[in-house]
């Protein structure tokens, strides 16, 4: 869609699949225990035309609707759109960097730091990709057999 092309970025749309933490009775989540993390996350798909409501202080994983392929000589950054930020909704917590060679849908780490619940719709433009040219192509890009590229070709939100 030509409307997604901005002067220095490409707008990305929200996908329809989300993962949220279940309310649990546990004192902590162990990031080394993949089964532990999976057990405490709940997946949902939002039907077309309906909204995903993110409440204040809530966190959710989602993906972009777009499947991207980053060439070996580019790096990309995910930035939230100002329209989301002005509602108190962030699109990434720490993982705003997309490696050269990455292929897949980009996982968004959505947080509502505002005071009101916010409706998010699949297909809505929520973030943008900003590309930067590297001086030389990556020697071992994301997806290279020598790398542990666990999110390569992901289609759904992936937890840690």
Description of each model-found segment:
Residues 1-160:
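DUTPase catalytic domain/fold
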């Amino acid at each position: 869609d030509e409307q997604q092309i901005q002067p220095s970025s490409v707008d990305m749309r929200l996908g329809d699949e989300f993962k949220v933490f279940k309310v649990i009775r546990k004192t902590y989540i162990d990031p080394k225990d993949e089964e532990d993390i999976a057990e405490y996350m709940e997946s949902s798909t939002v039907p077309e035309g309906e909204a995903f409501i993110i409440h204040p202080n809530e966190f959710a994983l989602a993906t972009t609707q777009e499947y991207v392929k980053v060439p070996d000589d580019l790096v990309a950054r995910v930035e939230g759109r100002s329209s989301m930020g002005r509602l108190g909704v962030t699109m990434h917590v720490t993982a705003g960097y997309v490696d050269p060679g990455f292929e897949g849908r980009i996982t968004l780490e959505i947080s509502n730091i505002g005071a009101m619940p916010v409706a998010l719709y699949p297909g809505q433009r929520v973030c943008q990709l900003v590309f930067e040219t590297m001086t030389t192509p990556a020697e071992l890009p994301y997806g290279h057999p020598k790398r542990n590229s666990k999110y390569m070709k992901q289609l759904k939100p992936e937890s840690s």
